[in-house]
Amino acid sequence: MVLIRVLANLLILQLSYAQKSSELVIGGDECNINEHRSLVAFFNSTGFFCSGTLINEEWVLTAAHCDNTNFQMKLGVHSKKVLNEDEQTRNPKEKFICPNKKNDEVLDKDIMLIKLDSRVSNSEHIVPLSLPSSPPSVGSVCHIMGWGSITPIKVTYPDVPYCAYINLLDDAVCQAGYPELLTEYRTLCAGILEGGKDTCGGDSGGPLICNGQFQGIVSFGAHPCGQGLKPGVYTKVFDYNHWIQSIIAGNTTVTCPQ
């Protein structure tokens, strides 16, 4: 079963696709406090439920399946229980999902751009991560991070984000693991073939950083997490560069690539 990685009232909703917004990094270690300065934590009335990535002082990029009616975004967070001096909280001013997204296909165009209600000030623990200048190559070393579950079956949510390194795999690996993953979906396949390292429930919307560039958004994967032949699937950011840049420039009617 594909796991959509989202936290909703601490329940994993097992649907035909279960996305990762409730998942944590499996097989990782606690992130260094300065290792995730672009990582954004999403909170609603029930608590943490998704992540995003700050791409400039006014915009955050996340997964479309992380959309929620009422939520706040916290930047500069490490421990969810201990306030950082430079931590900042923002609300969404505008949210943009691909107008040509197929609503009945949760895996299609799983990307959302959020304009903040006010600009973020860069600080010791808050620094934006630029959009990629080129697409990633198979074999690239990629960095994953998040507050998602750190155990693959029984959900265990950490107080601090966990980080791990995985590899960008050939798309054929994910096509074999997920026959329902259509070839036209603009996604990346990343993990460890022997298993044991993966994003998991609660990590949805967070970044996949390959060779220092922001290349992917946590979208979905298998349950249990960390299965070698069923790696994580990530929205391919590079393919959406034009859509993202057009919206930021004020062209809010632009469509996403098919």
Swiss-Prot record:
Signal peptide (UniProt feature, chain positions): 1-18
Alphabetical list of SUPFAM superfamilies matching this protein: Trypsin-like serine proteases
Propeptide: 19-24
Record InterPro entries: Peptidase_S1_PA, Peptidase_S1_PA_chymotrypsin, Peptidase_S1A, Trypsin_dom, TRYPSIN_HIS, TRYPSIN_SER
Domain of life: Eukaryota
Annotated localization: Secreted
Record bears the keyword Disulfide bond: yes
Keyword check for Acetylation: no
Similarity comment text for this entry: Belongs to the peptidase S1 family. Snake venom subfamily.
Protein name: Thrombin-like enzyme saxthrombin
Organism: Gloydius intermedius
